[in-house]
Amino acid sequence: MKTLGFIGVGELALYTIKGLRRGGYDGAILLSPRNRDKAALLQRKFDCQVQVDNQAVVANSDFVVISTRPEDCLETLAALRFRPGQVLISVVAGIDIARLGGVLNENLKIVRAMPVSSAEAAASPTLIYPEHDYVRELFAYCGNAICVDREDHFNQGSIIACVYSWFFALFEALTQATQGPRLPADVAAELVMGMAKGAAELALASRDRSPGQIAESIATDGTFSKLGLDLLKTEGAFEPWRKACKLLEQQLAEND
């Protein structure tokens, strides 16, 4: 099994490594020493090895994950000396392969990946570009690896990684709307999140129908489901979601 090194040990590295280990990945994982508290936690609980500096991580790894903050990424990479045959995996948002490659001392294979925090629960739908067999296998430990063959597809897909965080706010709003004297908050929360999980699993298992068609097949005339769905449509409840996605799309275009 290949040796995996992480440059940058923040929250993203933390939940990705937790997911790798909990998913069954047992290869060596090397860490940069920058964030001492998180690095020490990962060394103690998730069988990682803290190196003396970033260059030591690169020197001793086959695959190197760059997981710094975007503003630090290129400067950090430019200071490192890679060797032929290594693979760089970037989980840094907003920096394309051309810019990453432009600061490297070697012409490396570069793969972009976008795990989300559900990786910690081995449930991240991780977007990957370009397809790479080992990188796909790696992120499958954290959930599901989804490969695309164009970088603009990857960039557009990154919007959905942001939508992921909005779901939590929706879960909170629905829990607050349904809890009360007739339903305890913890039961409401479990039902809301369980229904969301069930709906997603049904939609994934029913690719012959769109999610909208599934909704219409359930929310039929005379049902409470239709009563509520019709109100949501009348009130334009879904339009702000479209606008929020368009806002992020515009921001991505400005950053290109």
Each model region followed by its residue ranges:
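NAD(P)-dependent Rossmann-like dehydrogenase/reductase catalytic/cofactor-binding core
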Residues: M193, K197-D256
